[in-house]
């Protein structure tokens, strides 16, 4: 997803979160990269972070759950390894899901 400087930040953030996290991130068209061009980067990252922080994570059978948990400890470990790898390569972790408390 590419977000240009004249984009509607709220619409772009809503779209990015929906595309990345909708259907528990298991869509064949789920996104994993958002390219923010120019000055839009900081407000977009903040808007996406706010939305992710407010996702309701819980069992899929609970009506208010928006995202289910990872299916196994093995899967969680793999995700943690991806986050650690990105951080080691210089990425800034904005929403850290390694130790989810909900």
Positions of predicted regions on the chain:
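ALDH superfamily catalytic-core signature
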Residues: 1-102
């Amino acid at each position: 997803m590419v977000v240009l400087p004249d984009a509607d930040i709220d619409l772009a953030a809503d779209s990015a979160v929906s595309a990345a996290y909708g259907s528990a991130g298991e869509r064949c068209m789920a996104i994993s990269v958002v390219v923010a061009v120019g000055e839009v980067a900081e407000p977009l990252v903040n808007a996406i972070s706010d939305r992710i922080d407010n996702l309701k994570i819980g069992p899929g059978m609970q009506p208010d759950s928006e995202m289910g948990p990872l299916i196994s400890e093995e899967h969680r470990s793999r995700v943690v390894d991806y986050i650690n790898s990105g951080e080691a390569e210089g990425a800034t972790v904005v929403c850290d899901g390694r130790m989810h408390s909900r």
